[in-house]
Amino acid sequence: MAHKKAGGSSRNGRDSESKRLGVKRYGGQFVLAGNIIVRQRGTEYHPGENVGIGKDHTLFALKDGTVQFTIKGAQRRRTVVIVPEAA
């Protein structure tokens, strides 16, 4: 009787799906209210003027304007600001 021995099983072969984090709109770019600027885990970037923060720490524009990245305070925090266009 011709038989084949059972093949071994691998304990590898799985990986988590990428979360697509990072900066979505860069300094100098024009954004509309509601546009996502940064997707992040924790507050790598902090919200400044005209920028809101979601429960997953996503930063988004509250007003139409130009994105600006600044470093503020004694802690040298990276802050995202929206400079509204002159009306």
Swiss-Prot record:
An annotated GO cellular component: cytosolic large ribosomal subunit
One Pfam entry name: Ribosomal_L27
SUPFAM superfamilies (UniProt xref): Ribosomal L27 protein-like (SSF110324)
GO-annotated molecular function: structural constituent of ribosome
Region described as Disordered: spans on this chain: 1-21
PROSITE patterns (alphabetical): RIBOSOMAL_L27
Keywords associated with the record: Ribonucleoprotein, Ribosomal protein
Keyword Repressor assigned: no
Alphabetical GO biological process terms: translation
Coiled coil: none
UniProt record similarity statement: Belongs to the bacterial ribosomal protein bL27 family.
Protein name, UniProt field: Large ribosomal subunit protein bL27
Organism: Aromatoleum aromaticum (strain DSM 19018 / LMG 30748 / EbN1) (Azoarcus sp. (strain EbN1))
Lineage summary: Bacteria, Pseudomonadati, Pseudomonadota, Betaproteobacteria, Rhodocyclales
